[in-house]
Every structure is written in structure tokens, then in C-alpha cells.
Amino acid sequence: MFSKNRNINQFQYAMESQTEFIMYIPDAINSLIHLLDNGSIIPECFKPNLTDINGFVGNLRHLPNKITSIETGLIRQVYFHGDIMIAGSVMYLKDIETLEFICKNIGFRLSLFVEWLYDNKSLHLLESIALSFPSNDVSYLLESVMQYRQNDTTKLIFNMFPSEYNKEIILRNAVITNNLEMLEFAIEKGAILSETDHLIVQSIRTSNLDLIKYIFSHIDLSKLIKLTDTVYYIYANAVYHYSHDVIVFLIESCIDYPDDLLFKLFASNQDCHETIDYIINLKYPDQNELNNILIHICRHSSQSEKYKSVYNSVEKLIELGADFTIDNYQVVIDILKSYFPNVVEIFVKNGLNPNVNPNILKTSIYCCNNFDITKYLIDNGADIHSDPSLIKTAITSGNLKTATFLMDNGAICDESDCEIITKNRHIFDNNFS
């Protein structure tokens, strides 16, 4: 008894003082070997320090003559406190017996275990230990392996544990991971797709036309087209995860597209011009539809991620006949309030007179606060001589450069505003020729 306590004390001292180098401390190694060989358990004080113990186990491969007894004791007593990498350390040692022990008790840590196998190019070892997994864990094992697109390993595990539930696991994960080979495998094994299955919508998100065609060939399209909500979400996802070929396939499969498809294409941040042209050739939009799309694009352009997308959409809509004069030119004012005020150039090029609504110039000064846009409007005929509030608006918005330009070009300026501009003129002198 005295000897055992002495060994524990030696090992505990080594763990607490210099854990990362414990394998190089002969007394500590000998004490641990003695404890394990005599059936002792690892003292509780070591178990919380899993990182250190894991490092110790990982270094055991440097002691080939002492691997089995040390590793088995440590793994079986400490592993289940949650450190998956202890299992990883065993993989270096290729100790199948201990691995099988882990597999039988792995539970919720299984996905981490598979991740470690994948990272260390050791997934092939599952062939040797798969039968050690409890049947309840096999579905989790299949899901974990499929995340890494290990098709051969997935097939092998399924053939070891064939079941209706496991077919569905493979079917679902094949679509989620965009894996046509495993989708075909699941269908060949008898997995069934229905028209109401959420996987149909999920498949659209892959933008993989071959996978989508395969799924649609295994469902009843005559039933699908009657499911209005499902069809709506199919097209919504086809736009969000944009693929021209997928949208064309859906339409050519006689799946009627929703009324707002053209609207969604214009509102997308993707370059959807090819599909827009395709839809317009099928059915030319009426004036009201074009106007509503233009209103939305201009009003919500600040939510867009790309200037080019907004510019191209507005340009195309004007080309198609959208009326930018509606609601007293509100779309022009909306675009001036956005992150992309340069789009106003499209309206000017298509005949906009900046004076038709005095708020156009004032918005460019106050909301847009962009000197180049204001100058562009003035260069294209915007009147700066009638409204006495323009310079004050520029000063209030902090745009002294615009205020100076307005004053120098004859805009009405009261004495206090002129004084402010004069005091700050030296800042802008270099900006004017």
C-alpha cells in the first residue's frame, strides 16, 4: 500500500510540474506502468487535465515496448471525459482493440472522431472497426462520413448496416452535400422521393443541373405542379442560388413560374440578364409590372451589395419601357438617397430634366451629399438660381465644397452663409480650376 501511494505521488508530482515532458521522466513513467500493470485506476486529480494527458498518450508511440498497458489504462479511464483527441492519439498506435472499445461507447463525440480520422487520412480504418459501433450510432456515422464525401466508405458502412432509415440518411445527405453519386446509390437501394419532400427545394440550392434532373426524373411532375407553395419556393431558391440553366430546365419541364419571377430576377444581386431576356421573350411584361419593379429597385437599392447590379437593372427597365416620371419622379429621388446615386445618370441620358421636381437637386445636395452628382445635375440644366435654400442646405449637410461651387456659380447666398464659405475657401481652392 505504501508503495502504491508513493508511485501515485511521484506521478502526480510529474503531472503537475512538467506534464508536457512527462514521458522523459523515468520515475514517473515507471510509476505509471507499475500502477496500470497492477490494476490501479488513474487518480481523479489527473482527469480534469485532459490536454496534458492527451499529450502524454500521444507521446507513447516513442515507447513501443510499453504501449499496450499504458495506453489502454489511460484511454479507458480518461477518454469519456470528453477529449476526442485521445482517441486520435490511439490511431497513431493502430490499437484496433482500444479503438473498438471507443466505438462502442463513443456517443455524441462520433462526428468529432470521424473529423479526426478524415484530417489524419485514416478513414480507411473504419472498415476494421465499423462493426464495433452500436446500431443506434450507425446513422450518425453515415452522416459524419458523408460530410467528407467519402463515397466508398459510406457504401461499405451501409452494406454492413442496411436499413430503410439508413437509406433515408444517405438520400438526405446526398442532396445536402450535392453528391450525385450517393443520390443514385440511395435511389438504387430503394430510397423514395415524394413531390412534397423538402429535398426537392434543397436540390435547387445546389445549382447542380445533373442532380436536379435526376431528382425530377424520380418524382411525379403532374403532382408537383399542383403544389403552389412548393413551386414558389423552388423558383425562389433558383433565383437566390442563381443558375440560368436550372430556371430554364424548370420552365421547360412545364412548371409554371410565379408572377413575381421577373421581379426577383431584377432584384437579385446576381447578374441575371440572360434569364431576364429569356423570360421577356416568353412573355413581355406590361407597363404596370415594369413600373413596379423600377420603383422597388430604386427604393431598395441601398440594400443591394453591387452597384453594377442596380445600374444594369435600372438601365434594362428603362430600355423595356418603365416610366421613371411616375409619382412625380420619386424613383429619381429614391436613387439619389441610395448608395449608388450615379445611377441617376441613366435617367438624365433618357431625357430627365432635373428641374421637373425641385427636390431632385436638393436631394442630391442634402441626402446624397455627393459633389460630383450635384455638379452633374447642374451641368445638365439643374436650376441653382431660383431656390435661396440650396447653399444653406449644402452647409447644413456639411458639404462646403458644394456650397462653394454653388456660390461661385451664382446661387443665392445670404451674408452669414457667404461668410462661412469665405472662411473655409482655402480648403477647396485646389479643387477648382
From Swiss-Prot:
InterPro entries listed in its UniProt record: Ankyrin_rpt-contain_sf
Keyword Chaperone: no
The ANK repeat ranges on this chain: 166-195, 197-224, 356-386, 388-415
Keywords (A to Z) from UniProt: ANK repeat, Repeat
Keyword Repeat annotated: yes
Name by which UniProt lists this protein: Putative ankyrin repeat protein R578
Organism for this UniProt entry: Acanthamoeba polyphaga mimivirus
